[in-house]
């Protein structure tokens, strides 16, 4: 579930429903959100057999769009339903099996129904053994060409000139807000535990600020994170929508619910829709930031009223998200390269010192600052058979010796590291009073010889998002 206000706080907002809501949230984490069996009604959907190009499934709201019932369309050939069907069929055959991104086939005209002869945008992708076609109101292509594309081109130039990731984020939220008109646009990244921190924000004055706030990992279940990696953009135009079921409910070719992972119109969990309403958010859009194949963060857009996002705008925003992802990946790779170069410099210096003195201990003791900088540590210990040399800020010698014994009992493990000594070394409770994390490397296969680096505890104040006025059940 995309971030907003902390979901746990929402549960606490109503004591009468807290138990049922807790169960709802637990169920939400298990919900197969890729197969909702329905779509959002800002468009309608048809599923075609890949080979025969006949209709296998259709959304019930086709009656609202075309004044035709689903059973009037099932089994019909593409060419029966759409003008220039042969041309469209050729375009559909060119869809890649590997690229599941919805592709704008063109603006099409239906041969019958209430929209007969009117242009309707058709977006399609190949997945789950079928062709999934989505139809929506056409966008103004001229406006997109004259406005959106120059904006994107200029934005890409600005990204390339950014000095760091924070500047990239600030530029991106401003640009996405300018392109989409959403009331609030923010970017947050995920830490190692999956919690999110808002780095940048651009908002209208009547929207509350989330800048600097953190959100718990539980707000986005694992299956939702996987979908954010697979499908880079997600739009909910109106949280009060009534979902339109598919007819028939299951894909006739597989006998299973249709996988809508990549569909723009894919319906949303009812729990999440209530979650949005409790945040006074009616429309939302999420753009994935994927770095090295992992979900690094999200560009999250909110609006207090229903808001349409046309295909051209979605395409521009997805491109912005992909460019931002590449730029962040490049910044991270550059920082990693610089760090490795610095490490190699430290290693050369330490090896030279050890060679000059013909001793590991004496060589490292001769370069205490370099030895500590190698691991960005505040203290270190050099352990040999007869010596325990301490550098910088370290635990007392007796606790270091106890740590060495504990390490020695871990047979066959040459490397140990932790960022939480109290959690990971409960056998030595006194140790956590002096250090928060450590790195230990065995340098002998026969003896208890170690290089150990220590880091102090780093206290961090986390500002979690406040709770809304209404509970999920309200």
Per-region residue spans from a language model:
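Amphipathic alpha-helical "output/dimerization" segments
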Residues: 151, 309-329, 467-469
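A generic structural motif
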Residues: 303-309
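Non-catalytic regulatory/interaction regions at protein termini and inter-domain linkers
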Residues: 2-154, 158, 163-167, 171-179, ...
